Amino acid sequence: MNLRLCSGCRHNGIVSEQGYEYCIFCESVFQKCTKVQKKSNFHVSNKLIHLRNVLRRLLSHQCSGEIISELLDIMEKNQISTDDVDANFVSSFLKANERINKKDYKLVFEIINQVKDEKLNLSTEKINEVVEIFKHLVFFCQENTPSKTINYSFFLDKIFDITSVTKNLKPQTVKNYTKNNSNQLVWENFLAHMRSKKRVTMVEDYGHEYVFVDERFSTCSLEV
């Protein structure tokens, strides 16, 4: 998928759907015809807008440098390696820090990225790959799962891993292990769906050959 230039924000962020186009950067929607669109298309549009916000956040430094320094001091005091920093550790730190009002997974991802001092591989080509896989995932969840909501931190970590954007943004596990296993099951079913779709339609990997490699994911522990 090639992202075209948006006439509004002048970024290469135009994604085409049947009957309309939208920009993942400035959220502009451009109607191509008067046909009423399916609700699912606009559902995907909203999800991609949120994805845009996540990608922008990961490439920014909105978190105060004082907060990062404080976290690094705690790590040094307790001899905690950057390799051991995950979403659970950062979330616990944020909950104990009264100076931070908004504690969401985007902030957690940003802090992990800064603490590990990692340069994310988010070139235009990589962004295209992430957007394409995420779009198929949203459609799959919409058609095959009871809930239309998506655990962004869980699935973006999976997508970032297979696209080699980063392996460091590990999501926070939840106390409900059934929910963790359910997300893993959805991901594995999505990969199986994409492999099956490839065989049926003879589409050449959607430009993402790695999506169809069996050994890239582990077996889900949820019995069905």
Curated annotation (Swiss-Prot):
Organism phylogeny: Viruses, Varidnaviria, Bamfordvirae, Nucleocytoviricota, Pokkesviricetes
Cited InterPro entries: Poxvirus_VLTF3 (IPR007031), VLTF-3_Zn_ribbon (IPR014900)
UniProt keyword annotations, A-Z: Activator, Late protein, Metal-binding, Transcription, Transcription regulation, Zinc, Zinc-finger
Pfam families cross-referenced by the UniProt entry: A2L_zn_ribbon, Pox_VLTF3
Keyword Transcription: yes
Zinc finger (unnamed): 6-26
This protein's name: Viral late gene transcription factor 3
A single BP term in Gene Ontology: DNA-templated viral transcription
Subunit text: Interacts with the late transcription elongation factor VLTF-4/OPG110. Interacts with the late transcription factors VLTF-1/OPG093.
Family: Belongs to the orthopoxvirus VLTF-3/OPG127 family.
Domain of life of the source: Viruses
GO molecular function, one term: zinc ion binding
Segments crossing the lipid bilayer: none
Purpose: Acts with RNA polymerase to initiate transcription from late gene promoters.
